[in-house]
Amino acid sequence: MKRGNEENNHKTSSSSSTQRLSRRKISAGEKSGNVNIPLDLTVEILKKLPAKSLLRFQCVSKQWLSIISSRRDFIDSIVTRSLTQPPPRDIKLIFHHQVLYPGPHFFIFSSTYPQNTDKESLTTRASSYHYVRGLICCWSHCPTTVDIYNPTTRQYYTVPDTNRYQYIETCFFGYDPVENQYKVMVLPKYYMEESPCQVFTVGDPIEKPWRDIQGIGVHFLLKDAVCINGVIYYQATNEYGSTYFLVSFDVRSEKFNHVKAPKILTDHPCTLINYQGKLGLIMCCKKGLEIWVMEDAEKKQD
């Protein structure tokens, strides 16, 4: 009987020690399951995901939020991928509604919304807007506000107040492909020698909020503008409104230049477009529409 009890006690102690041992193994296994993935590998994995998934995964951890929303090289890779890949199924429709009351508004509708709904993905007061390399700059002069909108992430960035102009007539948006920088340029209604324009570099904490840039003399600005290969082109008139001419603004050097153009284009207002990576001007004439294309931009600068 004693031997049997000893055997039972031995079996009990053995089984309990085995349970403790197995529990320790499970616990150790659970700890070993937390694999520490290197940061570079995490970034490469996230680069493979679609934009919609990235929006959801920002809440996974602080590290993922920082990578997706703040890491410049990661954001640039996503933008480059979206520009080189075929258009997505989720197409964004952009509308600029010009009304007197409650004022001009800017809308973005997503094609994935049901057709019978009036819910929009974005609505903001905007007198005009410019699109450059995946970002949209919306500006309003009543009140004076400038917002940068990313249609992929649906995030806003409000540009600080200029503290110079109470009434902004024109706002241009450009991208410098060399330094990989977006810049906002605001100008008063009448561009005078004593009234410099101001430039703001988006996302650069080192630069001053706004910098004064001297221009090329007195001229009256037209709102139409386009940014091509790091240069903003726009049309203007002299102070009497009798002559039209083209002006270029180099986003990197922040310098203005006159652009040489045929006289027929300086006699009438034109619509500026990006025509296969070159500056194109659309002009209405008696015969219909004419499209002029600038072949060599460097030779056309004064």
UniProtKB/Swiss-Prot annotation:
Alphabetical list of NCBIfam families matching this protein: F_box_assoc_1 (TIGR01640)
A Pfam family recorded for this sequence: F-box
UniProt superkingdom: Eukaryota
Organism: Arabidopsis thaliana
Cystines in this chain: none
Disordered: annotated segments: 1-27
SUPFAM superfamilies from the UniProt entry: F-box domain (SSF81383)
Compositional bias per record (Basic and acidic residues), positions renumbered to this chain: 1-10
Name this protein carries in UniProt: Putative F-box protein At1g32420
F-box domain boundaries: 31-78
